[in-house]
């Protein structure tokens, strides 16, 4: 169980939270489980609990970084979506950005997009107060800022290494200061596609976020991160930081798949069909969702019973239909794996 206020795990029988002094004997209007969306999210309770605990740390002033690794389509995005709902309920500002696949994106692209969102959602006075002494650097990377702060000066000229350090430091200072006013959660998806500069900035922020109300959550495909990948080097370097945690997201269990089937109206699906589906799709969360869509494109309907798209209407026919659906899923869902 978790504290309804800060999200930290609470010991059995505890009367108050050790982190925020919340009275655990008094019912809360908003608990962690209340804000987990009822959109078919099953399983992953351990992972969501770890992320919720990290959120509690950040809210309490201990900055955290959590990276989620796993196969494409395994459910990383779904997990962080649930965390975003919890963070929003805890009055944190949540900013979300994906790294760009392919060539052509400028350096620091995901960070610049996040900073643009920060500029758009913050009033000029609050933003200026959080930027610190190197505010001019922001005008170079986020041109929209100059419309809010027309008197913003031009940064002095430095050699490339010094300029990069000042840029990193100014962004880190802003995020730390802004999070003191209101906790900030940054979601960085698809870090396996991140450019080296973006990862270097991430490493810099990690080294100076311990005393902040900042939580950074990143996702990546572990099968696309080789030993010589820039992200592998980052992972090796951040292991020494107390605020870092890595979560490996595995396959859904047979029980999880069965629960998804039930939530989709398939409580009457034969167990051996559920077991075969679990084996064939190897517990991949995206494949499960696509499989359920294709088995009955029209949903469970008013009968709330599963309708097999199969005219044979027998066990052998069900299994043949399942094989056909899995082939369709595997050919059509590959491009949408996350």
Residue ranges of predicted features:
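Key residue(s) within conserved catalytic/signature motifs
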Residues: 2-338
């Amino acid at each position: 169980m978790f504290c309804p206020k800060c999200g930290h795990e609470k010991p059995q029988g505890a009367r108050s939270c050790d982190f925020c002094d919340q009275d655990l004997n008094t019912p809360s209007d908003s608990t962690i489980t209340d804000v987990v969306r009822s959109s078919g999210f099953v399983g992953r309770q351990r992972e969501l609990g770890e992320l919720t605990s990290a959120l509690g740390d950040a809210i309490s002033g201990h900055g955290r970084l959590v990276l989620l690794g796993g196969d494409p389509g395994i459910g990383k995005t779904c997990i962080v979506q649930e965390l975003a709902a919890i963070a929003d309920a805890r009055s944190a500002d949540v900013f979300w950005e994906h790294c760009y696949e392919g060539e052509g994106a400028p350096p620091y692209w995901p960070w610049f997009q996040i900073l643009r969102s920060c500029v758009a959602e913050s009033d000029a006075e609050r933003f200026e107060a959080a930027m610190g002494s190197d505010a001019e650097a922001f005008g170079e990377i986020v041109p929209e800022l100059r419309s809010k702060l027309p008197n913003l000066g031009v940064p002095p000229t430095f050699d490339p290494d010094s300029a990069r350090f000042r840029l990193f430091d100014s962004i880190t200072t802003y995020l730390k200061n802004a999070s003191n006013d209101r906790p900030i959660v940054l979601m960085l998806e698809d870090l396996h596609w991140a450019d080296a500069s973006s990862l270097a900035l991430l490493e810099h922020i990690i080294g100076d976020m311990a005393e902040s109300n900042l939580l950074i959550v990143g996702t990546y495909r572990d099968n696309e991160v080789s030993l010589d990948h820039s992200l592998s080097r980052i992972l090796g370097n951040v292991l020494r930081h107390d605020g870092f945690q890595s979560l490996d997201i595995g396959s859904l269990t047979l029980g999880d798949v069965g629960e998804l089937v039930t939530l989709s109206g398939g409580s009457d699906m034969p167990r051996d069909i559920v077991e075969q589906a679990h084996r064939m799709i190897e517990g991949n969360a995206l494949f499960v969702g696509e499989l359920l869509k294709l088995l009955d494109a029209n949903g469970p309907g008013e009968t709330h019973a599963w309708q097999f798209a199969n005219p044979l209407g027998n066990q052998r026919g069900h299994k043949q239909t399942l094989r056909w659906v899995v082939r369709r899923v595997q050919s059509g869902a590959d491009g949408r794996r996350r």
